[in-house]
Amino acid sequence: MAKVSSVQKNLKRSRLFNKLKLKRQALKSKIYDKNLSLEERFNLVLKLSKLPRNSSSTRIRNRCAETGRPRGYYRKFKLCRNIIRELAGSGIIPGLRKSSW
C-alpha cells in the first residue's frame, strides 16, 4: 500500500492539470505558431512558465486504483500487476486468464 499522502498529492496534481489543460494547450499552440513574432512568442513562453509546475501532464504519476502502487501499472485496467494477478486468478476480470503453453 502506498502512502496516502503520495496518492493525495497525485490526485491534487491531476485535478490541477484538468483545470488548466485548455489554457496550457492554447499557450503551447500559440508558441509554436510561426506567424507570430519572436518577441510575442517569447512573452507567451514566459506566461506558460508562470503556470504551476503541477499543472503539467508529466508531473502526474500513474498509480494503481486499488493500492496506489506507482510501478507495474497497466493502463488498460488502471491496476498494478500484483492486483491484476490476484483478480485474474480468482476470475474477476472477464476474458483474462493465466497463460499456458
UniProtKB/Swiss-Prot annotation:
Keyword terms: Ribonucleoprotein, Ribosomal protein, RNA-binding, rRNA-binding
Gene Ontology MF term list: rRNA binding; structural constituent of ribosome
One annotated GO biological process: translation
Keyword Coiled coil assigned: no
Gene3D superfamilies: 1.10.287.1480
Superkingdom classification of source: Bacteria
One Pfam entry name: Ribosomal_S14
One cellular component term from this protein's GO annotations in UniProt: small ribosomal subunit
This protein's record includes keyword Ribosomal protein: yes
PROSITE patterns, sorted: RIBOSOMAL_S14
Quaternary structure, from the entry: Part of the 30S ribosomal subunit. Contacts proteins S3 and S10.
HAMAP family hit by this protein: Ribosomal_uS14_1 (MF_00537)
Family assignment from sequence similarity: Belongs to the universal ribosomal protein uS14 family.
Described purpose of this protein according to its UniProt entry: Binds 16S rRNA, required for the assembly of 30S particles and may also be responsible for determining the conformation of the 16S rRNA at the A site.
Name of the molecule in the record: Small ribosomal subunit protein uS14
Organism name: Orientia tsutsugamushi (strain Boryong) (Rickettsia tsutsugamushi)
